[in-house]
Amino acid sequence: MELKALDIINKFEALNKLADKETDLSTAIIIAKNLKELSTYKEIITKKRDIIIIKYAERNDDDVVVRDENGNVKITDVDGFNKDISEILDTIIEVNLLLLPKDKMMDMKISAKDILPLTDILDGEL
């Protein structure tokens, strides 16, 4: 399955929330395998994002990254930063994800926001 990097991040976060829910063994294994498959790509995406943040970070006279009052890194060239981040998040990556058995997850409590990134890997009618 081909996914954009942004979709990998969203699926990883949604699966991570599912991983805390109680389910049958086979579904738990599928969730765990999918998390493992996505985690490597998520780490690579995060490292590339961090490199871009450092590239565009504002620095003081001592070459220390400047942060705002909330602890966020101040960016010097917002347009360049957004362009580079968008390029990373739009990158297409081939991943091998297993389908989640919808019928085994019917008793799970999950928000629409959390299930949305997973709808294309649900096995069964919606």
Model-derived features: where do they sit?
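Low-complexity intrinsically disordered segments
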Residues: 43-126
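N-terminal interaction modules that seed assembly of large macromolecular complexes
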Residues: 2-57
